[in-house]
Amino acid sequence: GRLLGGVGAGRAPATVHPGAVYLHQGETYVVDSLDLESAIAFVHAEDPGYSTHAREVTDIEITGTGEHTDLGSVTLGVVPVAVTNTVTGYLRRTLSGEILDFVELTLPPQHLPTVAVMYTITPEALSANGIDPLRIPGSLHAAEHAAIGLLPLVASCDRGDIGGLSMAIGPGGLPTVFVYDGHPGGAGFADRGYRQATTWLGATLEAISACECRTGCPSCVQSPKCGNGNDPLDKPGAIAVLRTVLAALEVGRPLDGRSPA
């Protein structure tokens, strides 16, 4: 055998699980086995005519106090967290996008102690901005995806260095969005997002609003590594979420050198 390439340990269960279709330098391979203890996956060359898409369950727990800014109906914070991620299986899709089937997997959970930038919004504030309870999950999810894509604007990272999770009912009982560093102990990316929240989330809002699609696309709110298959996503709701947060930031403590308007 020969070494083809490498993937991050934390992403291995989602990208090189048994049965996964793995692309490397234009060639297609299928994964035969994954040994997490030895950190090695065995593959064979094959083009099966379908793609695979891992399904994951992610949980997050705040493990320390961190730093918070209370903006009334919105709170912003940067906190230590413990992220637990479990790959439960994968979808097989034809090249035209048709779902063939779902294959269950039994893989151990992956644990990541790291740092996250987070914000919460009261349900009342969301309702006042046109987001009823049924739309909260998709609105937060879409805002989270877009924010992950724009964090490299203020932090020296790329999309693969960070992860996220949105919750209609977060650890504090409120709708919550987390964006976390994908490195054990954190790498400073989330902290930069917290310090420059107005710039970061403002650019995120602009990017979504400028995209001409109606319901969301890979250029705005869809994510190529979403463990939930980009469902649910509510693009108009994401715009309302970000406007709500930015309006609170505008009258609260400026976090990135900007004066309140």
Segments predicted by a language model, with ranges:
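Extended Lys/Arg-rich polyanion-binding regions
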Residues: 1-211, 230-245, 255-257, 261
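Local cysteine-cluster metal-coordination motifs and their immediate loop/turn environment
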Residues: 214-225
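Alpha-helical transmembrane segments and their immediate juxtamembrane flanks
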Residues: 250-252
